[in-house]
Structure formats: structure tokens, C-alpha cells
Amino acid sequence: MKPVKHWLLLVRSSNLNKTGLDIYAKAALGNQELLFLFLSVSLVLHDYFPTFALYVIPKNMTYLDTDKQTQADLSITEGIYDEYPLYSLFSGTETKNGKRMMLDWITSPLNDISAIRKRQEAIAWKELPELPLDEEELDFIEYYLEYRDQIRRPNILVSLTSAFDRLLRHDAQRYIIRRGVTLIILLLNRLDTLRKNTLENAPLLLKELAQSIQDTIHGSELKEVIGLYKDKEKSPSNYTIDKYDYLFRCIHFELIRGLLSQIYMLDVCRTAQHVAINRGFCCCPEMTDTMDLSITGFVHPFTKEGRSNDWKMSNGNICILTGSNMAGKSTTLKAITIAVWLAHCGLPVPARSMICPVFDGIYTSINLPDSLRDGRSHFMAEILRIKEVLQKAKSGKRCLIILDEMFRGTNAQDALEASVAVNELLKKYLHCSFLISTHILEYAKHFEKDSACSFYYMDSRIQNDQFICPYQLIEGISEAQVGYWLVRKELESLHY
């Protein structure tokens, strides 16, 4: 897959004079190196976009392919059927922009093994530094940077005049500028201290953070503030405020933005580490270029006191999961897929350990709706969805494909024959892994001796006239037949 590059424009009023805008284009190159292209446009644009800024973080990495149906099935950002969204697990960041970056991470899984490992190693690092400022201070800096006022060149006479004027009246505008400048000076000093304290054996992501701080601060005029006003109690002069306001919001606006982005990334890593520690998640699942896929001690992250299970793709490229209704087949499929999804985000997974291929795509067919508008039945929706995901497999992508209860919208004989036909087709796509749940035991037994298939079942049984469902995943094919018992048990009160 070719690298996906998000090219961006940072549009910012220069305020050097009223003759135009400075437009900076950033493009990500290699290891976070940035190319800044400077363009100028006419006064006409300045009239329409005074002090306007649009900031988008550039990216140069490859992403795992998926679709809206899969994200809905896994409840990535929105829960269905009263399920919690997966994002809510990791939404407890210290900053608002950290929350936005976490959302970006969890909705955009990677298929770049080095980028995934880089995130994992940083999250697992026990000596992650604290954020240099608290949430309120960082929010104030964001507000200050976007504050819509005239940025002026530093001038001693103007500074003295404005200082005298402010003795006579309270100036809210000046307070915003003064506090914003003071906080950025404090921020730059603390970031420089963080850089100096970065250990030689620190993870690559933290070393890159330290190098970015070094290049940004000491490779520009920002180095002037290092050593100045480290304490909040000391206040810079009015001329100094004007000087650095011009430096921060005009000349090096984009550099300050870049440093803030690094802080939010640190916030994301700290939050993910906190989740891993509190929930016992695995920070570093082993990502591999082979098709080995196995998980030990996995659970669905939102099941209360859920039983942990072990699973692996032990045979071929197809795993058929059987079991009675209510045994937990769909939840198990979701738990496995969520673990694979989070592993590709570089985030901790709800398991003790995991070996996971780096997939090109993840696709599911779990909660398919009917369509009254299109006149499409549930059965037809299933057929079209299976066709859609198999086209992805046919394209040569290495995919994880989840099919939950294929062809439940038709009669048992049709469902059996259709499932067998689909399974024969799946065997051709050796570069993909397929997890299929079914309650049609005849379908599973049809492939019992096929080397392309492995088999697991969710245990359930009737014991002392009670339905026992331990949610235990076991190798083999289920023999449980409890449907009639459940119907009889629930309806027996209707008999007179």
C-alpha cells in the first residue's frame, strides 16, 4: 500500500504589514522531517481572512483499510444496542486536544509495523514524562494563539505608552497576551528540560520527541527564551511581552503548534499506559509479517467479570466457531477483532499476550440492517456484504474478515448449502484470515477434516434442568442442542 499523505496548509495572517498572508505548507517526509514551503498571496485574501489559522497535522504513514460497517459492528466511536463505544476506554486524556488525537489514533489503525511498534514501546515505557503544563494552561495557550487581535512589531516607545495607559484602566486584551506569552516561555523551558532528561535507552518515539524539541527550539529564535522567567512569579517587561508575542504568534506560530502537537501525543501515550495498568491489558502484542495469529487471556473489554479465553488460528486460514444461541459466539468474535484492531492502533489490547499479523484491512459482517428504502431483505444484505468483503480479499490485500452467523435470513437448508459454497471460496484466499460463527453444525462438520479449517466452540449445556453457559472457548465442534429446551422453558408458563 502506498503511503497515505495528508498534505496541509497552515494559513496565518503575517501582520508584518497589510499586504498579504503567509501560507505555510507542511509535508511529512521520512522520520517526522518537515518541509516548509513559503507562499504569499495578495491583499485581497487578507481582507477576507484576517488572522485566520487552519492547522492540520501532517502524516506520512500507511493505514489499515476498513469501512463504516466494520466500525459500527465493533462500536469504535458509537455504541449500538446499548454497548459502550471502544473509544470510551481511552478517552480519559488530560487535555482536550489529547482527546482529539486519541480519537484519531483509534479510528485510524496503522498497517506500518515500525510505526505500530514505536507507539507500543512508548506506551510500555515506565518512565513516561509528565506533561509540562496542566490542561487549563495548555487550553489558554491555544486560546492565545488564535486570539484575534493586531500583532505588532516590538517597539519600546509603544510599549511604554501602552503600559502607562494600562495603569489607568484594566485591559483584558493585554492580560490575554501577557499570560499567553508567559505560559509559552514557561512551556519552552520545561520542554527543554524534558529533552535534557530523556534517557539514552528511551523508546524511539520519546527520542524523536526530544530531537524535535531540540530542532524546534535550538534551531530557531525560540532558543532566546531558554533560561528566561522559569518561575511563574517573575513577570517579563512590556517590551519583552510585545517582542515574544510577535515571535510566537507571527514568526514561529507553526513551530509552537508543532510542539503542542508533541505534547498531545505524550498525553495519548500516558493515557493508554494508565488504561493498560488499571485493566491489565497487554501493551506490546507481537506484530509479525507472517500469518500467525493467536491470543491468550483475551476478554471483551466491556463484559463485566468476563471469562478470559485463549485462541489461535491453528489450521489453515479459516476458523469456524460453533455453539448454541446465547453461548457468546458474537461477543467472542468481537473480542478477538477488537484486540486485532487495537493492536494496529498501537494501543494496549485486552489480553495477556498476543501474536498478530500486520493486516491491510479488517472487515466484519455482524449487525446488518434491512433496507426498506432499497427494498433489500436481510438475506440479500448478507449476500451483498459477503460479496463486498470478498472483493477486498480478491484484490490481494491481507485481510481479517469476520462473518457472524452467515445466511441467518433464509431457511436452514439454503443456509447450509450457501455457507458451504462460501467456505469453499474462502479457502482460495490464503493471504487472509476468516473467522466465521455458525449454529449450523452440519456446515462445520462438512469441513471437519479439511486442513484449511480450524474449529472452536463456546461451551453450553443443560445441567439439572438449568442452562449453563460458562463462556469458555474450547477447540472442536459443539454438540450442544439447547434451542428447543430454551423455547420450552420460556413458553411453559403459557400452558394451561
Residue ranges and their predicted role:
Residues 25, 41, 47, 53-56:
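Short hydrophobic alpha-helical segments enriched in small aliphatic residues
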Residues 57-221, 255, 262-265:
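Conserved amphipathic alpha-helical "coupling/scaffold" segments
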Residues 237-281:
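Charged, surface-exposed helical/loop "interaction arms" that form contiguous linear patches used
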Residues 279-496:
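ATPase nucleotide-binding head domains, primarily ABC-like/P-loop NTPase cores
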